[in-house]
Protein backbone atom coordinates (compact mmCIF):
# COMPACT_ATOMS: atom_id res chain seq x y z
CA UNK A 1 0.00 0.00 0.00
CA UNK A 2 1.43 3.40 -0.95
CA UNK A 3 0.74 6.63 0.93
CA UNK A 4 -2.14 7.64 -1.34
CA UNK A 5 -3.91 4.36 -0.56
CA UNK A 6 -3.83 4.80 3.22
CA UNK A 7 -7.49 5.08 4.33
CA UNK A 8 -9.01 7.99 6.19
CA UNK A 9 -10.25 7.11 9.67
CA UNK A 10 -12.63 8.85 12.07
CA UNK A 11 -13.02 8.72 15.84
CA UNK A 12 -16.02 10.00 17.77
CA UNK A 13 -14.64 11.81 20.82
CA UNK A 14 -16.37 11.72 24.24
CA UNK A 15 -17.94 15.16 23.67
CA UNK A 16 -19.35 14.10 20.30
CA UNK A 17 -16.80 15.79 18.05
CA UNK A 18 -15.21 13.93 15.14
CA UNK A 19 -11.44 13.48 14.95
CA UNK A 20 -10.01 12.49 11.56
CA UNK A 21 -6.69 10.73 11.13
CA UNK A 22 -4.56 8.43 8.98
CA UNK A 23 -2.02 5.81 10.03
CA UNK A 24 1.01 5.67 7.74
CA UNK A 25 4.01 3.37 7.92
CA UNK A 26 3.48 0.07 9.74
CA UNK A 27 0.09 0.19 11.53
CA UNK A 28 1.14 -2.49 14.03
CA UNK A 29 4.45 -0.76 14.76
CA UNK A 30 5.75 1.64 17.38
CA UNK A 31 3.29 4.56 17.61
CA UNK A 32 4.39 8.06 16.64
CA UNK A 33 1.79 10.83 16.55
CA UNK A 34 2.79 13.64 14.22
CA UNK A 35 0.91 16.95 14.11
CA UNK A 36 0.74 18.99 10.92
CA UNK A 37 1.44 22.69 10.46
CA UNK A 38 -0.69 25.74 9.66
CA UNK A 39 -2.62 25.15 7.53
CA UNK A 40 -2.41 21.41 6.95
CA UNK A 41 -4.05 18.06 7.38
CA UNK A 42 -3.47 14.37 8.02
CA UNK A 43 -2.02 14.15 4.51
CA UNK A 44 0.94 16.44 5.24
CA UNK A 45 3.20 13.75 6.69
CA UNK A 46 2.44 11.15 4.01
CA UNK A 47 5.89 11.68 2.49
CA UNK A 48 7.36 9.70 5.43
CA UNK A 49 5.16 6.65 4.81
CA UNK A 50 7.83 4.41 3.27
CA UNK A 51 10.53 5.41 5.75
CA UNK A 52 8.24 4.62 8.68
CA UNK A 53 7.15 1.34 7.18
CA UNK A 54 10.81 0.34 6.93
CA UNK A 55 11.43 1.33 10.55
CA UNK A 56 8.35 -0.46 11.84
CA UNK A 57 6.75 2.81 12.94
CA UNK A 58 3.02 3.49 12.99
CA UNK A 59 2.92 7.14 11.92
CA UNK A 60 -0.39 8.45 13.26
CA UNK A 61 -1.41 11.71 11.59
CA UNK A 62 -4.48 13.43 13.06
CA UNK A 63 -6.20 16.46 11.62
CA UNK A 64 -5.81 19.13 14.29
CA UNK A 65 -8.74 21.24 15.56
CA UNK A 66 -10.80 22.66 12.70
CA UNK A 67 -8.77 21.05 9.93
CA UNK A 68 -9.71 18.27 7.53
CA UNK A 69 -12.15 15.89 9.18
CA UNK A 70 -11.62 17.14 12.75
CA UNK A 71 -14.14 19.35 14.47
CA UNK A 72 -12.97 22.04 16.87
CA UNK A 73 -14.20 22.44 20.44
CA UNK A 74 -16.19 25.55 21.26
CA UNK A 75 -13.46 26.68 23.66
CA UNK A 76 -10.06 25.89 22.19
CA UNK A 77 -7.64 25.77 25.14
CA UNK A 78 -4.24 24.47 24.04
CA UNK A 79 -3.69 22.19 27.04
CA UNK A 80 -7.00 20.43 26.36
CA UNK A 81 -5.63 19.08 23.09
CA UNK A 82 -3.91 16.39 25.15
CA UNK A 83 -7.33 14.96 26.01
CA UNK A 84 -8.09 14.38 22.32
CA UNK A 85 -4.77 12.64 21.79
CA UNK A 86 -5.30 10.49 24.89
CA UNK A 87 -8.66 9.42 23.46
CA UNK A 88 -7.07 8.63 20.09
CA UNK A 89 -4.29 6.56 21.65
CA UNK A 90 -6.80 4.70 23.82
CA UNK A 91 -8.87 3.98 20.70
CA UNK A 92 -5.80 2.60 18.89
CA UNK A 93 -4.66 0.61 21.93
CA UNK A 94 -1.40 2.45 22.65
CA UNK A 95 -0.50 3.04 26.30
CA UNK A 96 2.66 4.98 25.41
CA UNK A 97 3.74 6.79 22.27
CA UNK A 98 6.04 9.39 20.74
CA UNK A 99 4.76 12.81 19.67
CA UNK A 100 6.02 15.29 17.11
CA UNK A 101 4.86 18.55 15.62
CA UNK A 102 5.95 20.55 12.61
CA UNK A 103 5.68 24.33 12.51
CA UNK A 104 2.21 25.27 13.83
CA UNK A 105 1.74 21.74 15.17
CA UNK A 106 4.61 22.19 17.64
CA UNK A 107 2.63 23.98 20.39
CA UNK A 108 0.09 21.14 20.32
CA UNK A 109 2.85 18.54 20.56
CA UNK A 110 4.26 20.43 23.54
CA UNK A 111 0.84 20.41 25.21
CA UNK A 112 0.54 16.65 24.78
CA UNK A 113 4.05 16.03 26.13
CA UNK A 114 3.50 18.34 29.12
CA UNK A 115 0.03 17.04 30.02
CA UNK A 116 0.49 13.31 29.32
CA UNK A 117 3.89 12.95 30.95
CA UNK A 118 3.54 9.27 31.83
CA UNK A 119 2.50 8.30 28.29
CA UNK A 120 4.94 10.22 26.07
CA UNK A 121 8.21 8.46 25.26
CA UNK A 122 9.84 11.25 23.23
CA UNK A 123 8.91 14.55 21.62
CA UNK A 124 10.16 16.12 18.39
CA UNK A 125 9.73 19.73 17.30
CA UNK A 126 10.35 20.40 13.60
CA UNK A 127 10.72 24.01 12.41
CA UNK A 128 8.49 24.90 15.38
CA UNK A 129 6.40 27.89 16.30
CA UNK A 130 7.72 28.72 19.76
CA UNK A 131 6.14 30.41 22.81
CA UNK A 132 6.20 33.95 21.45
CA UNK A 133 3.97 35.51 24.12
CA UNK A 134 5.43 33.50 27.02
CA UNK A 135 8.92 34.64 26.07
CA UNK A 136 7.86 38.28 25.64
CA UNK A 137 9.30 38.38 22.14
CA UNK A 138 6.66 40.55 20.48
CA UNK A 139 8.65 43.82 20.36
CA UNK A 140 11.76 42.08 19.00
CA UNK A 141 10.06 40.31 16.09
CA UNK A 142 10.56 41.26 12.48
CA UNK A 143 7.71 43.27 10.96
CA UNK A 144 6.43 40.22 9.08
CA UNK A 145 6.55 37.96 12.13
CA UNK A 146 4.99 40.63 14.34
CA UNK A 147 2.10 40.99 11.90
CA UNK A 148 1.56 37.24 11.46
CA UNK A 149 1.88 36.24 15.10
CA UNK A 150 0.61 39.23 17.10
CA UNK A 151 -1.51 41.50 14.86
CA UNK A 152 -3.33 39.19 12.43
CA UNK A 153 -4.81 36.99 15.19
CA UNK A 154 -6.86 39.99 16.38
CA UNK A 155 -8.78 40.09 13.09
CA UNK A 156 -10.48 36.73 12.46
CA UNK A 157 -12.34 38.18 9.47
CA UNK A 158 -9.06 38.96 7.77
CA UNK A 159 -7.78 35.46 8.60
CA UNK A 160 -10.90 33.97 7.03
CA UNK A 161 -10.56 36.03 3.86
CA UNK A 162 -6.85 35.26 3.52
CA UNK A 163 -7.19 31.51 3.92
CA UNK A 164 -10.29 31.30 1.73
CA UNK A 165 -8.37 33.13 -0.96
CA UNK A 166 -5.41 30.83 -0.52
CA UNK A 167 -7.56 27.72 -0.86
CA UNK A 168 -9.15 29.15 -4.01
CA UNK A 169 -5.65 29.67 -5.40
CA UNK A 170 -4.60 26.13 -4.47
CA UNK A 171 -7.55 24.73 -6.40
CA UNK A 172 -7.57 27.07 -9.40
CA UNK A 173 -4.00 28.31 -9.81
CA UNK A 174 -1.69 25.91 -7.95
CA UNK A 175 1.48 27.39 -9.41
CA UNK A 176 0.50 30.80 -8.11
CA UNK A 177 -0.35 29.26 -4.74
CA UNK A 178 3.08 27.65 -4.57
CA UNK A 179 4.73 30.98 -5.34
CA UNK A 180 2.58 32.71 -2.73
CA UNK A 181 3.47 30.06 -0.16
CA UNK A 182 7.19 30.68 -0.60
CA UNK A 183 7.13 34.41 -1.39
CA UNK A 184 9.27 35.18 1.68
CA UNK A 185 10.89 31.77 1.95
CA UNK A 186 14.54 30.80 1.76
CA UNK A 187 15.82 29.90 -1.73
CA UNK A 188 16.11 26.24 -0.74
CA UNK A 189 12.41 26.18 0.21
CA UNK A 190 11.51 27.71 -3.15
CA UNK A 191 13.52 24.97 -4.86
CA UNK A 192 11.69 22.29 -2.89
CA UNK A 193 8.19 23.60 -3.58
CA UNK A 194 9.06 23.88 -7.29
CA UNK A 195 9.29 20.07 -7.40
CA UNK A 196 6.01 18.68 -8.73
CA UNK A 197 5.86 15.87 -6.16
CA UNK A 198 6.45 18.21 -3.22
CA UNK A 199 4.03 20.85 -4.49
CA UNK A 200 1.31 18.24 -5.02
CA UNK A 201 1.72 16.84 -1.53
CA UNK A 202 1.98 20.17 0.30
CA UNK A 203 -0.81 21.96 -1.57
CA UNK A 204 -3.03 18.89 -1.40
CA UNK A 205 -2.62 18.85 2.37
CA UNK A 206 -3.53 22.53 2.59
CA UNK A 207 -6.61 22.06 0.42
CA UNK A 208 -7.85 19.16 2.53
CA UNK A 209 -7.05 21.00 5.74
CA UNK A 210 -9.33 23.90 4.79
CA UNK A 211 -12.27 21.74 3.71
CA UNK A 212 -14.27 22.73 6.82
CA UNK A 213 -13.44 26.41 6.45
CA UNK A 214 -10.99 28.61 8.31
CA UNK A 215 -11.69 27.70 11.94
CA UNK A 216 -8.38 25.81 12.13
CA UNK A 217 -6.16 28.77 11.18
CA UNK A 218 -8.19 31.09 13.40
CA UNK A 219 -7.59 28.84 16.41
CA UNK A 220 -3.91 28.42 15.59
CA UNK A 221 -3.18 32.12 15.22
CA UNK A 222 -5.03 32.88 18.44
CA UNK A 223 -3.00 30.24 20.28
CA UNK A 224 0.29 31.45 18.79
CA UNK A 225 -0.38 35.01 19.97
CA UNK A 226 -1.05 34.29 23.65
CA UNK A 227 0.59 32.38 26.53
CA UNK A 228 0.24 28.63 26.09
CA UNK A 229 -1.15 28.07 29.57
CA UNK A 230 1.03 25.20 30.79
CA UNK A 231 4.57 24.74 32.07
CA UNK A 232 6.98 23.41 29.44
CA UNK A 233 9.26 22.30 32.29
CA UNK A 234 6.76 19.50 32.97
CA UNK A 235 7.99 17.72 29.84
CA UNK A 236 10.17 14.87 31.06
CA UNK A 237 10.53 12.81 27.89
CA UNK A 238 13.62 13.21 25.71
CA UNK A 239 13.01 16.25 23.51
CA UNK A 240 14.68 17.54 20.38
CA UNK A 241 14.23 20.62 18.23
CA UNK A 242 15.28 20.88 14.59
CA UNK A 243 15.50 24.33 12.97
CA UNK A 244 16.90 25.45 9.65
CA UNK A 245 19.31 28.35 9.75
CA UNK A 246 17.62 29.84 6.69
CA UNK A 247 14.06 29.40 8.03
CA UNK A 248 12.12 32.63 7.50
CA UNK A 249 8.68 31.31 8.45
CA UNK A 250 9.05 31.13 12.24
CA UNK A 251 10.85 33.44 14.68
CA UNK A 252 14.16 31.76 15.50
CA UNK A 253 14.31 33.42 18.94
CA UNK A 254 11.03 31.73 19.85
CA UNK A 255 12.43 28.37 18.74
CA UNK A 256 15.33 28.75 21.17
CA UNK A 257 12.94 29.96 23.89
CA UNK A 258 10.96 26.74 23.41
CA UNK A 259 14.06 24.59 23.79
CA UNK A 260 15.32 26.56 26.80
CA UNK A 261 12.11 25.90 28.73
CA UNK A 262 12.18 22.12 28.25
CA UNK A 263 14.60 20.19 30.49
CA UNK A 264 17.54 18.68 28.61
CA UNK A 265 16.09 19.57 25.20
CA UNK A 266 18.58 19.12 22.36
CA UNK A 267 18.68 21.69 19.56
CA UNK A 268 19.82 20.62 16.10
CA UNK A 269 20.54 23.58 13.84
CA UNK A 270 20.71 22.99 10.11
CA UNK A 271 22.61 26.03 8.79
CA UNK A 272 21.78 25.68 5.10
CA UNK A 273 18.18 24.49 5.47
CA UNK A 274 14.85 26.32 5.41
CA UNK A 275 11.40 25.75 6.85
CA UNK A 276 10.60 22.73 4.66
CA UNK A 277 13.82 20.82 5.28
CA UNK A 278 12.04 17.74 6.67
CA UNK A 279 10.46 17.08 3.26
CA UNK A 280 13.89 16.38 1.79
CA UNK A 281 15.24 14.64 4.91
CA UNK A 282 12.18 12.66 5.92
CA UNK A 283 14.04 9.89 7.74
CA UNK A 284 15.76 12.08 10.35
CA UNK A 285 12.89 12.61 12.78
CA UNK A 286 11.31 9.11 12.64
CA UNK A 287 14.74 7.49 13.07
CA UNK A 288 15.48 9.58 16.16
CA UNK A 289 12.07 8.93 17.72
CA UNK A 290 12.36 5.22 16.94
CA UNK A 291 15.81 4.99 18.54
CA UNK A 292 14.78 6.90 21.67
CA UNK A 293 11.61 4.86 22.13
CA UNK A 294 13.49 1.59 21.77
CA UNK A 295 16.11 2.74 24.26
CA UNK A 296 13.36 3.68 26.72
CA UNK A 297 11.92 0.20 26.34
CA UNK A 298 15.33 -1.40 26.85
CA UNK A 299 15.49 -2.74 23.30
CA UNK A 300 18.55 -2.89 21.09
CA UNK A 301 18.53 -2.37 17.34
Model regions and ranges:
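Active-site glycine-rich loops that stabilize anionic/oxyanionic intermediates
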Residues: 26-29, 36-41, 103
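The serine-hydrolase catalytic nucleophile loop
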Residues: 38-50
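Conserved alpha/beta-hydrolase
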Residues: 52-72
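Conserved acidic catalytic loop of the alpha/beta-hydrolase fold
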Residues: 80-97
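Conserved hydrolase catalytic core segment
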Residues: 96-139
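Alpha/beta-hydrolase
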Residues: 143-230
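Short beta-strand/loop motif that positions the catalytic acidic residue
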Residues: 235, 241-243, 247
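Catalytic active-site module of serine/aspartate enzymes centered on a nucleophile-bearing elbow/loop
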Residues: 264-301
Amino acid sequence: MNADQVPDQRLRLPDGRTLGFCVYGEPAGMPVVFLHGTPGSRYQIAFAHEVCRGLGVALIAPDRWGYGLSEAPSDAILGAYADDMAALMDHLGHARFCIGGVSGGAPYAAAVAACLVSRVLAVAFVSPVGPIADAGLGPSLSLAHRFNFTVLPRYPGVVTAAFRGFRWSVRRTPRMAARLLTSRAAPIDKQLIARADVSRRVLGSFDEGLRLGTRGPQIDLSIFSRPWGFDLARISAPARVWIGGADRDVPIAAVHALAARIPHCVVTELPEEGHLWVVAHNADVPEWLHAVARASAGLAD
